[in-house]
């Protein structure tokens, strides 16, 4: 009886994973809802529902958006640093040590150390989409569930009780 209870629990978990919404490219997932995103420099103050839209609030001066729900205080460069970029409602302050020299090319900030005569590069890696991860996880859990169900049915039909009471058990047992 325990394998049957475990199988039912596993099925309920699998159904819950299947109910998870996958939002469109122009939406963000807030809780269990797919909502339109807030504008630049705004944070979510109330999640949307099926009947209401998301409520957004601009971050106050001296803060920037950090995630979907938070405004974080801007960093203040200390005396050993120079400010490269001011804090805005969408980005934190960028500070760097004073012993570096800076130069700009169109749209790109570079810095070069005086002592080592080389350019430092910042690499930004694009994350994998959560949708692909969720799809593979759901498929894996589904396949494990099917395998467990098959093993449970084989064990049930091979048991002596099933062979004595069920004619289909006898037929199934002979074919294995």
Swiss-Prot record:
Residues 1-20 form the signal peptide. Disulfide bonds join 59-71, 74-87, 77-95. One of its GO terms (biological process) is negative regulation of alpha-beta T cell proliferation. It is found in: Membrane. Keywords: Activation of host NF-kappa-B by virus, Disulfide bond, Host-virus interaction, Membrane, Repeat, Signal, Transmembrane, Transmembrane helix. The chain crosses the membrane at residues 134-154. GO terms for cellular component: membrane. InterPro entries: TNFR/NGFR_Cys_rich_reg. The keyword Transmembrane applies. PROSITE patterns: TNFR_NGFR_1, TNFR_NGFR_2. It is a single-pass membrane protein. The keyword Oxidoreductase does not apply. TNFR-Cys repeats lie at residues 58-95. Activates NF-kappa-B in a tumor necrosis factor receptor (TNFR)-associated factor 6 (TRAF6)-dependent manner, causing the up-regulation of the chemokine CCL22. Interacts with host TRIM23; this interaction causes auto-ubiquitination of TRAF6, leading to NF-kappaB activation. This is Membrane glycoprotein UL144. It comes from Human cytomegalovirus (strain Merlin) (HHV-5). The lineage of its organism: Viruses, Duplodnaviria, Heunggongvirae, Peploviricota, Herviviricetes. The gene is UL144.
């Amino acid at each position: 009886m325990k394998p049957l209870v475990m199988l039912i629990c596993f099925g309920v978990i699998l159904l819950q994973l299947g109910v998870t919404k996958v939002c469109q490219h122009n939406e963000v997932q807030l809780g269990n809802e797919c909502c339109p995103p807030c504008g630049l420099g705004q944070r979510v103050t109330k999640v949307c529902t099926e009947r209401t839209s998301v409520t957004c609030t601009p971050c106050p001066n001296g803060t920037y958006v950090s995630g979907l729900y938070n405004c974080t205080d801007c960093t203040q460069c200390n005396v050993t640093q120079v400010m490269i970029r001011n804090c805005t409602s969408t980005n934190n302050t960028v500070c760097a040590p004073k012993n570096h020299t800076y130069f700009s090319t169109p749209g790109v900030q570079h810095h070069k150390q005086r002592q080592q005569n080389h350019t430092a590069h910042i690499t930004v890696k694009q994350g994998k989409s959560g949708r692909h991860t969720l799809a593979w996880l759901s498929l894996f859990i589904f396949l494990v569930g099917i395998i467990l169900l098959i093993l449970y049915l084989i064990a049930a039909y091979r048991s002596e009780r099933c062979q004595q009471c069920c004619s289909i058990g006898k037929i199934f047992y002979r074919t294995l």
